[in-house]
Amino acid sequence: HNLPAAAPYSGEEGWKELCRRDDIDLVYICTPWQLHVPMAVYAMEHGKHVAVEVPAAMSLDECWQLVDTAEKTQRHCMMLENCVYDFFELTTLNMAQHGLFGEILHTEGSYIHNLEPYWDYYQGNWRLDFNQSHRGDVYATHGLGPACQLLDIHRGDKMNYLVAMDTKSVNGLKLAKEKMGAETFANADQTLTLIKTERGRTILLEHNVYTPRPYSRMYQLTGTEGFANKYPVEGYAFRPEQIAGEEIPDHENLSEHSFIPQAAKAALMERYKHPIARDIEEKARRVGGHGGMDFIMDYRLVYCLQHGLPLDQDVYDAAEWSCIGSLTSASLEHNSMPVAVPDFTRGDWDKVDGFRHAMAQ
């Protein structure tokens, strides 16, 4: 491609030199979690837009640092939440925006992923070390991001408060003893969070990276007119009269109260395939990156920057989705007491009418 060789930067302070360059527009941060905010803030203060891996921030104070710096510098700060770009999520979001599910009342999301084969890949045990000292849902964004887009969070609704519960730590503690010699482990084997929104909807989150449960981000929505579910089985359900040719189920046969047939599902997904997926799906699947969603995420980031459009994920998304770790910890430490979710928009949560992907005219 006749591109110049990449310029290497190393050492504890090398990244600052990169941020100070005047020929860079965007700084892309993929480091251990604790470095996300210092690097993002420094980059924005030096005139750079920022794309930062998940979670973007690890404390409430860090969430506010990102918001305040982005507002002060007028730089974009996008958290790299890739799961909002998976194909089922994009299509289901498009269906929701066309009203197929009626009013969405409840959503579910999770990060259930047995990391037992992967812990050694985290240099210096940085991820396990963080979990060892932090209780709560420390990795909520993969499940929460798609849920928030469905519910138009800070675009017509907002998260008001949450409560969290967790199990004791068994596998996590055993793992930490083996790898770090730790005698205590704060992060539970299973953590659950319930969130209530201003408009009376709910979100359920789960976190579990220690037990042999099959991988799941749950991704589920319950609406007044329909239902969608991704894990463990993709499917949709609607009122019988919404689907042409469907008979009313026999109430004595519970197996008939089920998903629409596969042929109807396939036709529905093709009809409501998201315009972004329709445009770029083939190339995204060919290039790959978690099945193509990483490619779509980067494509959308560059597309919006090049066309001067609002990013799909703004700094308020980054703060809202990342603050769950701190808030669930506070709830758990006070016997699952409700904890308020900050309004990072400072009152502007209903100024935008619904979530939409910005497109150039």
Predicted regions located by residue number:
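C-terminal helical cap and adjacent loop that interface with cofactors, partners, or active-site loops
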Residues: 148, 214-222, 229-230, 240-361
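Predominantly a Rossmann-like dinucleotide-binding segment in NAD(P)-dependent oxidoreductases
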Residues: 73-78, 83-185, 301
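Beta-strand-loop-alpha-helix segment that lines the small-molecule cofactor/substrate pocket
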Residues: 25-26, 32-33, 37-85, 99
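A short catalytic or substrate-binding loop motif that flags glycine-/basic-rich loops and adjacent residues
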Residues: 141, 184-189, 197-198, 212-213
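Glycine-rich phosphate/pyrophosphate-binding beta-alpha loops
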Residues: 189, 205-215, 289-290
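Short, well-ordered coil/turn residues at beta-beta hairpins
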Residues: 30-31, 194-197, 206, 211, ...
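N-terminal Rossmann-like dinucleotide-binding module
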Residues: 1-3
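A structured beta-alpha segment of the ubiquitous adenosine-cofactor-binding alpha/beta core
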Residues: 6-26
